[in-house]
Structures are given as structure tokens and as C-alpha cells.
């Protein structure tokens, strides 16, 4: 197996520092798709400082084996052959600080006023849980209502500029801090430096930059009104989206002046299956795992949908699910193209 020596050294170093790790971990249980082969080594750092320790060790011990840093893996597809390297799961790095409770470096970001509150969140913090916390009577913070049903982490949402129901991360982000795998430096970017656009940020262009935390600016409002908006969004999701089956959320980026789901349905692909993967019969913008689906099933189904839509509309849908590939397949990396 490639990189065994470096991975063994990493495992030993993690144990010495009290960082939990496991060998040959099945990744299907860690993804919302419930799909994926085994990762050679998986680490669970307990907070941002341990994430930095893990990444520093990876660099110090060679920096050659494949590495992927994931949160709740709600928007990813892991190949059936697995990941022959180190996967870092950040879900235990979930510290959240509200500026009204504890000082945030206000000089580094934007001065708050009586109408707003800065919120600092480590990359592994649950976006949905954070939105629920903001809606409590003692908080009454508005801006994250769109996120109440998004299953990912703050880090993943920052990378993808996640959004729904007219809101997105771009509308609330002040800054984010990242670790650069190429040199070991940590860097803070202001929102205007993050290249935020529809389902895009500069982090997608720089996979070597690992988001450590984000700072958001939320507005004070009526907690009951905030909760009412969240309940409306939640019910809308339940009514229209296939939450009863594993998926990776919306599959395709929204085209200009159209909807991906509508286009997929128009070309007759709603309900189409490949193996255990199916275009949802409830919402054609989703692909669900009906049981036993493989990554290969999903990829083949995505390609069939793209081909069918392109044949009619002369437009190729862009898949927004991220493939976690170790780059070791002799046939080349897996892509949606």
C-alpha cells in the first residue's frame, strides 16, 4: 500500500498527542450519501488547535500522502475504491463564540453596534445547530434562517458559499481563517477577498487552503419571527425534498434563468435509476441512495442526466457535489466531466 510508512508515523504521532485516529475506516458511515470505500487513516482532531497540529504533522512527516479535510461530508462523493491516504474529520472542532458573551477581535474585523453581533465558529460547527442557537429567545439573531436545514458544517458552507431560500453565507460572512498546506501558514481573509459567488468561493480554487474558522455578522431581531421563518423553510424542505433517503443534497448548480430539477424532469430523467442510485421521484434535482448504491452508480447516473439535458437544452449541468479523490488511480482522477 502506498505511503504506509508516512501514515504509520502519522498514526503514532497522533496517539502520542491524544488525537483519535483509526486505520481502514469505512467512509460510507461518515457521508450523507452513505456511500464510499475505506480510508487508510482517519483522524478526529478535537478542536482548531488539534486540526493545526494534524496538518503540521502531515507536513513535517513528508507531506506526500493524499490528504482530505472533511466536515459532515454532506456534499461529497467518496469513490468505491476508497481513499488511500489521510482523511481529517473536523466535526469535533465545533467551538462557537458570540461577541456579546466573549470578546472577539473586533479590530481584526468590523466594529459591531447595538444592532449586530459577531459570531465566531470553528470549521466543524454544525450550521443547522448554529442557526437554531441563534433563534433562541436569549439570542434573537437573524441571518442564518436559510441554514436551518443545511446538514453541513460552517467550514463546508464557507467553502461552497452554501445557501437556500434567498440567503447564503456571502450575506453574513465577515472573514475566515485558513491553513495553507503548502507552507504551514495560517491566513485570515476578509469576505471581500474570498471570491464569494453562487456556490463558489476562493477555497474551491485552492484545495490546499483548509478553512479553520469563520466570523459572521448577524442582526438582532425578534426571536419568534426568526423561528417562524425557520419553521417555514423547514416545512418547505420536508414537503419538496427527499429527506427520507440518503443523498448529498442538490446535485446540480442552478442554471441562469432556469431550474436544474425542472430541466431534469423535462427530459424524462425523474425517477431514473442506475443500480441503487435514483433521480428522486420527489425532486428531480436530487439523487438518492435507495439502498446499496455505489459511487460508480451515482457518477453514471449524473453523466446520463447531464447528457440528456445537454441534448435538449444545449447546456451541460454543472455538478456541485465534490469528489474526494486521492489521485492515485492509474486511469486518472474521477471528475464529473
Regions found by a protein language model. Give the residues of each.
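Short coil/turn segments at secondary-structure junctions
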Residues: 113-114, 160, 289-290
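Structural signature of FAD isoalloxazine-binding scaffolds in flavoprotein oxidoreductases
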Residues: 41-48, 77-101, 123, 159-191, ...
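Phosphate/pyrophosphate- and phosphate-bearing ligand-binding catalytic cores of soluble enzymes
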Residues: 21-23, 29, 76, 179-303, ...
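Anion-binding (especially nucleotide phosphate/pyrophosphate-binding) glycine-rich loop
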Residues: 2-154
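A generic local secondary-structure boundary/capping motif
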Residues: 75-76, 132-135, 144-148, 161-168, ...
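Short, flexible micro-motifs
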Residues: 39, 74-78, 88, 127, ...
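Short, well-ordered alpha-helical segments in soluble proteins
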Residues: 134, 138, 154, 158-162, ...
